[in-house]
Regions:
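Feature of Fe-S/electron-transfer and energy-metabolism proteins
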Residues: 1-191
Length: 191
């Protein structure tokens, strides 16, 4: 088996694994970009780990990079199986037990801390804006930054599951140098 075929197989397997975990277990994701860390995200992350361990919860706890709402850091997302991913902002360590007790264990969103939710999946939450309704995000069409806030920047598995290295594999095995140059020119990369 070639390295490219192995990469494709690994990507498919990781996407399936992440999809199953995302559907079957609650997920808590903390924004751990430099802005989040400076605002206290590392302490919030540790408080989540401690609370999950103390309660013996079967929850996926992860991190992601900056999504772009630095003024609301630390950010914490909760997604229950079959539900929307809800973002909480300006989260303090003292808020962690309340978010876990209310949202993770009882499915009740903590409205005073909720800042937005991801509208993919056809969800609508009354009184909480979706990301595409927020002024900062509504006119954005993320291309190069499409994975920001969605993958763990320290996880090679997350990167591969999101299609990382696929373009490199294609360039090295399927395209001529002239085709690569034409592709880059046609892409119209900007920003």
């Amino acid at each position: 088996m070639s390295a490219v075929a192995e990469l494709r197989e690994l990507g498919n397997r990781l996407r399936q694994q992440f999809s199953q975990n995302g559907r079957s277990k609650p997920r808590i994701i903390v924004g751990m970009g430099t802005c989040g860390i400076a605002a206290g995200a590392r302490e919030v992350f540790q408080a989540i780990i401690q609370e999950v361990e103390n309660r013996r919860l079967d929850v996926v706890v992860g991190q992601t990079g900056c999504i772009g709402m630095c003024q609301k850091e630390p950010l914490l997302d909760v997604q229950l199986p079959g539900g929307p991913r809800v973002t909480y902002g300006n989260v303090a360590v003292k808020d962690v037990p309340r978010i876990i007790a209310s949202h993770v264990l009882n499915g009740k969103i903590v409205a005073d801390l909720a800042v937005a939710y991801f509208a993919d999946g056809g969800f609508h939450l009354e009184g909480i804006p979706s990301y595409d309704q927020l002024d900062f995000f509504k006119k954005q069409h993320r291309i190069a930054l499409a994975n920001c806030g969605h993958i763990d920047p320290e996880s090679i598995d997350d990167y591969i599951a999101a299609g990382g290295y696929a373009a490199c594999a294609k360039v090295l095995t399927e395209m001529t140098p002239e085709e690569v140059i034409a592709e880059v020119k046609e892409a119209g990369l900007r920003g």
